[in-house]
């Protein structure tokens, strides 16, 4: 079951990095433009 834990940690780290990069940008661009 170690693989499951490692996968969860990897996804969590990627999510945190993604959020950090996303929030680092100024909220000038509307969220509707992404979709």
Curated annotation (Swiss-Prot):
- Record-linked InterPro entries: PSII_PsbT, PSII_PsbT_sf
Q: Which SUPFAM superfamilies match?
A: Photosystem II reaction center protein T, PsbT
Q: Does the keyword rRNA-binding apply?
A: no
Where is this chain's protein located in or outside the cell?
Plastid, Chloroplast thylakoid membrane
> Which Pfam families does the record match to this protein?
PsbT
> Which positions, given as ranges, span the membrane?
3-23
GO CC terms of this entry: chloroplast thylakoid membrane; photosystem II reaction center
**Keywords, A to Z?**
Chloroplast, Membrane, Photosynthesis, Photosystem II, Plastid, Thylakoid, Transmembrane, Transmembrane helix
The primary location reported for this protein is plastid
GO BP field: photosynthesis
Membrane topology value = Single-pass membrane protein
Q: Which domain of life is it from?
A: Eukaryota
The function of this protein is: Found at the monomer-monomer interface of the photosystem II (PS II) dimer, plays a role in assembly and dimerization of PSII. PSII is a light-driven water plastoquinone oxidoreductase, using light energy to abstract electrons from H(2)O, generating a proton gradient subsequently used for ATP formation.
Subunit: PSII is composed of 1 copy each of membrane proteins PsbA, PsbB, PsbC, PsbD, PsbE, PsbF, PsbH, PsbI, PsbJ, PsbK, PsbL, PsbM, PsbT, PsbY, PsbZ, Psb30/Ycf12, at least 3 peripheral proteins of the oxygen-evolving complex and a large number of cofactors. It forms dimeric complexes.
Family stated for the protein in its record: Belongs to the PsbT family.
Q: Which HAMAP family match?
A: PSII_PsbT
Q: What is this protein called?
A: Photosystem II reaction center protein T
Q: Which gene holds the coding sequence for this protein?
A: psbT
